[in-house]
Amino acid sequence: MAKIYRDVDASLEPLKGKTIAVIGYGIQGRAQALNLRDSGLNVILGLRRGGKSWDQAVAEGFRVFEIGQAVAKADVVMVLIPDMEQPKVWEEQIEPNLKPGTVVDFAHGFNIHFGLIKPPPNVDVVMVAPKGPGRAVREEYLSGRGVPALVAVYQNYSGRAMEYALAIAKGIGATRAGVIETTFAEETETDLIGEQTVLVGGLMELIKKGFETLVELGYQPEVAYFEVLNEAKLIMDLIWQRGIYGMLNGVSDTAKYGGLTVGPKIIDESVKQRMREAAARVRSGEFAKEWVTEYNRGGPTLRKLMEEVKNHQIEKVGIEMRRLLFGQ
C-alpha cells in the first residue's frame, strides 16, 4: 500500500532560515518559486542572464542570479529546467558550485535514474514531482488547495532528506492534496511508460485510427472529428471525476453495452504484450539512450514525426472545428 503524506505530516521548519535556489523560471519553476515564497521561505532564482525569463522574475520581485552564483548561495537547489538541458547545466554550473550538505531537488527522475547526472556523495538528492502542470500548481495553491505530488529520496547524506523533500512539497502546496512516497526508478519508469503507451502515444493513435476509419467508411470528417476527438474530453472528464465505473454510470445504456462488449475486441490482450515490450525498452534504458542520441543530433526524427501529425487530416479538420467551437 502506498505511503501518503498529508499537510499534518510535513513541516516547513527544515527550510526556515535556508536559501532556496530555484533553477529555471518556466511554467513549473515559476509556480513553485512563487508558492515557496508565499509560504514564507527565502527563494532566489538561478537563470541565464539575458534569457527571456530574467526580466519577468525581477519584475515579480525575485532576486535573480546567474545559475552558478545562485547555487553557491543556496542550501537547497531545485533543478526545474527541461530534462534534456539539465546534464550540461549540471556539469558546467551546478555541480562546481554545490556546497557539502546541499539539498538537490528534481521534479522528474530521468537524469538521475539513467545516470546522465551523477551527484557527488556529500549532498542530499530528492524529488518532488507535482502531478499536474505548473499553472495548476499555482492556481490550486492560491485557492487554498494543492496538486498531488510524488516524493522520493535518492541520496540521504544528511539523514534528513525526506524531511527536506516533504518541506518542499508542503511549501508548494502539494501536501494539501496528498504526497505519495515513491522511488526515482518508479517515478521515471511509470511516467515514461504511461506517456508512451496511454497518455500521449496510445490515446493519440487510438483517436487518429478511429477518425481514419470513420472517414474511410464515407462519413463526413467533421462528424468523425466530433465523435472521436471532441467528445473524448467529455468522457475523460467523467473518468477523472468519477472513475471508470462512475463514467459508465454517466453514459447511456446503449453506450455502456456497446463499449463493454466491443471495447475489449479493439483493445485486446495483445495490446498488453506490446505495452510490456515498450516498458522493457524504458526499463532497460534503451529508450533513454535513443532519445538522448536523437536530442543531441538536433531532433530530426522528432521534427519529421511532428510534421506528419501537423499534416494529418484530423488536424486540418480540427483547426476549423476549434474555430467554430471556441473562436480560435
UniProtKB/Swiss-Prot annotation:
One of its GO terms (biological process) is isoleucine biosynthetic process. NCBIfam families: ilvC, PRK05479.1. Its EC number is 1.1.1.86. Residues 183-328 form the KARI C-terminal knotted domain. PROSITE patterns: KARI_C, KARI_N. Mg(2+) 1 binds at residues 191, 195. This is Ketol-acid reductoisomerase (NADP(+)). NADP(+) binds at residues 25-28, 48, 53, 83-86, 134. Mg(2+) 2 binds at residues 191, 227, 231. It holds the Pfam family KARI_N. It catalyses: (2R)-2,3-dihydroxy-3-methylbutanoate + NADP(+) = (2S)-2-acetolactate + NADPH + H(+); (2R,3R)-2,3-dihydroxy-3-methylpentanoate + NADP(+) = (S)-2-ethyl-2-hydroxy-3-oxobutanoate + NADPH + H(+). The keyword NADP applies. Belongs to the ketol-acid reductoisomerase family. Involved in the biosynthesis of branched-chain amino acids (BCAA). Catalyzes an alkyl-migration followed by a ketol-acid reduction of (S)-2-acetolactate (S2AL) to yield (R)-2,3-dihydroxy-isovalerate. In the isomerase reaction, S2AL is rearranged via a Mg-dependent methyl migration to produce 3-hydroxy-3-methyl-2-ketobutyrate (HMKB). In the reductase reaction, this 2-ketoacid undergoes a metal-dependent reduction by NADPH to yield (R)-2,3-dihydroxy-isovalerate.
